[in-house]
Amino acid sequence: MTDQGENEKKQRRSNATIAVACLSFFVCMIGAAYASVPLYRIFCQVTGYGGTTQRVEQYSNTILDKTIKVRFDANIANGLPWDFKPMQREVTVRIGETTMIKYEAHNLFGEETYGRASFNVAPGRAGAYFNKVECFCFTDNTLKPGEDLELPVVFFVDPEFVNDPDLKDVKTITLSYTFFPIDKPKPVVNAKAVGSTRNGG
């Protein structure tokens, strides 16, 4: 009887240990899932992996005679009552040449709405060579009822594009944006104005 009781206690302890281990693993997996999204975004922005374009501060110093066609795609996620489209569907540019195109957004709703865009490039490998000098991605945008907004994109294709053997047959690059609904952005406090008020002026 005593041996049976001891065995039952050992079994309960073993079950408890397994339960704790499973719970810990589950919690860790949930945390990793939440952390993986921003980490993956950072990784893609740095490397151009997965069709993420490169953000640069300067223009290309080299312009080649070789040209490539760039197409523009626009999408709206569920819950955002906007009309969103490129003002030009495609352009043919010289590789290394800086080009500006524009998208436009229109609020179809009777109230103020808020959106933020993400982007992607196809084929994915071309993202490492698609350099944006100016864009509206990851910026909070507010549109009043019926308001229109022009959204410029300034870009060039890195001349190193032609040296990548995996892209030798690529004649067209597609830049795609998707707008998602977001909560109303919090107002930015003017620190100077607050300080002046506290000082009596």
From Swiss-Prot:
MF (Gene Ontology): copper ion binding
TM spans (from-to): 14-36
GO terms for biological process, alphabetical: respiratory chain complex IV assembly
Pfam families referenced in this protein's UniProt entry, alphabetically: CtaG_Cox11
Membrane topology classification: Single-pass type II membrane protein
Subcellular location: Cell inner membrane
GO cellular component: plasma membrane
Domain of life: Bacteria
UniProt topological domain (Periplasmic) ranges: 37-201
InterPro entries: CtaG/Cox11_dom_sf (IPR023471), Cyt_c_oxidase_assmbl_CtaG (IPR007533)
Sequence ranges on the Cytoplasmic membrane side: 1-13
Keywords, alphabetical: Cell inner membrane, Cell membrane, Copper, Membrane, Signal-anchor, Transmembrane, Transmembrane helix
Main function: Exerts its effect at some terminal stage of cytochrome c oxidase synthesis, probably by being involved in the insertion of the copper B into subunit I.
Xref: HAMAP family: CtaG
Similarity comment: family membership: Belongs to the COX11/CtaG family.
Protein known as: Cytochrome c oxidase assembly protein CtaG
The species this protein was found in: Brucella ovis (strain ATCC 25840 / 63/290 / NCTC 10512)
Gene: ctaG
